[in-house]
């Protein structure tokens, strides 16, 4: 950091390599337009500098110069020709300094004397005006040299007679049938594309609403507990599509399989509940089912001492 010697007495970190003084941006624009200027810390690291243009390798004092936002100095003519070789579709961020690869166009919200002068210089070329969003000017277009036609010296002229055949065979007519027909219409303001496809009985334009009335989520239903059927319906929609699909498109086989699955699941649940309740059929250890323990039941007991008839 240093203090500029101009009447403004501004504290600055810019340093002029040629005059070896600290300069502010106002002095840089007015009094040091063709001097090599970098930060003071850069000068402390390396005091050597190149007074030539990085593009044409000639002295910077020989022509008009442009100082980029990174403080690198180049000939305006060399820089204009270098940037004009970029494609017309190059984005503003694609233009970068050939020395340090920093963006050429400064941010829109950044304001300083150096940036204001840089923007004024860039407006003198159509490639920069297009990148800045300004209309291009015809007088700023670069002249395109027309290629000179090749000159033929002492070239012999050969005349060759081509026989004319009157008995040419007629070309058979060819009929092309295309299923898809595409047509487009272009205007000055917008571009409209129309395409028609043949899908049998189905029409290409579907005017069904994306959301049905039952899909609406009211405020009063937002925090209401959902019934079980809504939960089942949500699973069905997640598996086989939303409610916007017509019923005739649903597969009857899938519906039947889903109903059978629910019936089997309910049957298994009932069997497990009854088994837990004690109706499994194993009553050998239960005294209530022992006929010998019931006093109302008389069972004849065979005596081995009685004679058999």
From Swiss-Prot:
<keyword id="KW-0863">Zinc-finger</keyword>
<dbReference type="InterPro" id="IPR001841">
    <property type="entry name" value="Znf_RING"/>
</dbReference>
<feature type="zinc finger region" description="RING-type; atypical">
    <location>
        <begin position="53"/>
        <end position="101"/>
    </location>
</feature>
<dbReference type="InterPro" id="IPR013083">
    <property type="entry name" value="Znf_RING/FYVE/PHD"/>
</dbReference>
<comment type="similarity">
    <text>Belongs to the ZFPL1 family.</text>
</comment>
<feature type="transmembrane region" description="Helical">
    <location>
        <begin position="254"/>
        <end position="274"/>
    </location>
</feature>
<keyword id="KW-0812">Transmembrane</keyword>
<dbReference type="GO" id="GO:0008270">
    <property type="term" value="F:zinc ion binding"/>
</dbReference>
<dbReference type="GO" id="GO:0016020">
    <property type="term" value="C:membrane"/>
</dbReference>
<feature type="region of interest" description="Disordered">
    <location>
        <begin position="200"/>
        <end position="221"/>
    </location>
</feature>
<keyword id="KW-0862">Zinc</keyword>
<dbReference type="InterPro" id="IPR039043">
    <property type="entry name" value="ZFPL1"/>
</dbReference>
<feature type="zinc finger region" description="B box-type; degenerate">
    <location>
        <begin position="1"/>
        <end position="43"/>
    </location>
</feature>
<protein>
    <recommendedName>
        <fullName>Zinc finger protein-like 1 homolog</fullName>
    </recommendedName>
</protein>
<keyword id="KW-0479">Metal-binding</keyword>
<keyword id="KW-1133">Transmembrane helix</keyword>
<keyword id="KW-0472">Membrane</keyword>
<dbReference type="GO" id="GO:0005794">
    <property type="term" value="C:Golgi apparatus"/>
</dbReference>
């Amino acid at each position: 950091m240093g203090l500029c010697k101009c009447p403004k007495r501004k504290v600055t970190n810019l340093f002029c390599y040629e005059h070896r003084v600290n300069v502010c941006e106002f002095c840089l624009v007015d009094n040091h337009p063709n001097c090599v200027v970098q930060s003071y810390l850069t000068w402390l690291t390396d005091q050597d500098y190149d007074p030539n243009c990085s593009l044409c390798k000639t002295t910077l004092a020989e022509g008009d110069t442009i100082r980029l936002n990174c403080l690198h100095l180049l000939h305006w003519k060399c820089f204009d020709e270098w940037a004009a070789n970029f494609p017309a579709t190059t984005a503003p961020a694609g233009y970068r300094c050939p020395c340090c690869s920093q963006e050429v166009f400064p941010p829109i919200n950044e304001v300083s004397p150096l940036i204001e002068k840089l923007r004024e210089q860039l407006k003198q070329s159509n490639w920069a005006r297009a990148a800045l969003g300004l209309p291009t000017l015809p007088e700023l277009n670069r002249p395109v040299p027309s290629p000179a036609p090749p000159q033929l010296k002492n070239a012999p002229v050969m005349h060759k007679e081509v026989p004319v055949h009157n008995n040419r065979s007629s070309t058979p007519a060819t009929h092309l049938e295309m299923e898809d027909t595409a047509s487009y219409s272009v205007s000055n303001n917008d571009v409209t594309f129309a395409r028609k496809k043949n899908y049998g009985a189905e029409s290409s334009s579907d005017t069904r609403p994306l959301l049905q009335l039952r899909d609406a989520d009211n405020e009063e239903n937002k925090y209401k507990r959902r019934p079980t059927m809504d939960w089942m319906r949500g699973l069905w929609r997640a598996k086989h599509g939303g409610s916007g699909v017509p019923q005739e498109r649903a597969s009857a086989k899938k519906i039947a399989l889903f109903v059978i699955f629910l019936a089997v699941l309910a049957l298994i649940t009932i069997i497990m509940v009854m088994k837990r309740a004690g109706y499994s059929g194993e009553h050998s250890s239960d005294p209530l089912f022992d006929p010998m323990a019931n006093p109302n039941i008389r069972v004849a007991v065979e005596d081995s001492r009685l004679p058999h008839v």
